[in-house]
Amino acid sequence: MTRHARNCTAGAVYTYNEKKRDAAESGYGTNAQRLGKDSVKSFDCCSLTLQPCRRPVITKDGYLFDKEAILQYIVTKKNEYSRRLKEYERLRRAEEDKLSQEANSKQQARMERFVNAEKPAMTPAHSSAAASEKPSTSSAAAAASSESSSASSISNMTNGHEKKLPSFWLPSECPNAGLAKAQKPDATIYCPVSQKPLRVKDLIDVKFTLLKDGDTKRSLIAKEARYMCPITHDVLSNAVPCAVLRPTGDVVTMECVERLIRKDMIHPLTDRKLKEKDIIPLQRGGTGYATTNDHLQAKEKRPMLQA
């Protein structure tokens, strides 16, 4: 009986299983993982802190945040923009100084070439007389210049070369290494979830209606069913699609929106006229089903191995 199971490593095809195993062990390539129910926040939790919101606010795209957390995020992004703007100004000034120095050096070189071209040429008789007057000096100078040129061509510690590193493999010593190109930073603050422009005045206060269950012993966070629809009194959960009414911030179920509100487009609590943009669907929490949430795959970018 041959040992086929022991000789299964000599295949001519690089299988999918081998690729996945090698990618996991080598540390290269992008890692992807399917998110389960425990990895997705609840519908009433902040998208930044992943904790139940104390002062909930919602964006126009339906992402819920704690007001303190999202304001702190906006302040941090503004401070980061100020820091990047200062760095941009510094790089721009350095680039302007470099360009002015190059222009000055080119102008100086042109002036020197012009002056040298305008100098009168020496006659042959004058040049021979000058050479006959000091033959020893010219020969000594020629010998000294030849020695200095030979020394400079051999040694790397003369004529200022001792300050230059011979480490050609360093990024700063590469031929194309230089000052970073100045790029003006973007002043727009983007939503940390949807990556769309975010402004403080676009945040809408959300008002959850507490569920009247009569249980006063447990805290609100310890309860699984915490809120209800103020119109139908249905319990709100991750499996129940909800929407926020912009004028008052009340959270109602989508079933209530479709059956009661969309008929007349009137707010059932205040009798105010509603528009389509006043109904903001709330992003749902994790239920464990693939059709509930849009983004259920987490990716970790790692270095790519190129052959």
Swiss-Prot record:
Function, in words: Negatively regulates nitric oxide production by inducing nitric oxide synthase translocation to actin cytoskeleton and inhibiting its enzymatic activity.
Location relative to the cell: Cytoplasm; Nucleus
Keyword tags: Cytoplasm, Nucleus
Residue ranges, compositional bias (Low complexity): 127-155
Name of the molecule in the record: Nitric oxide synthase-interacting protein homolog
Entry's Gene Ontology cellular component terms: catalytic step 2 spliceosome; cytoplasm; nucleus
Gene source species: Drosophila melanogaster (Fruit fly)
GO BP annotations, alphabetical order: mRNA splicing, via spliceosome; negative regulation of catalytic activity; negative regulation of nitric-oxide synthase activity
Family: Belongs to the NOSIP family.
Xref: InterPro entries: NOSIP, Znf-NOSIP, Znf_RING/FYVE/PHD
GO molecular function, one term: RNA binding
Annotated region (Disordered), positions in chain: 120-159
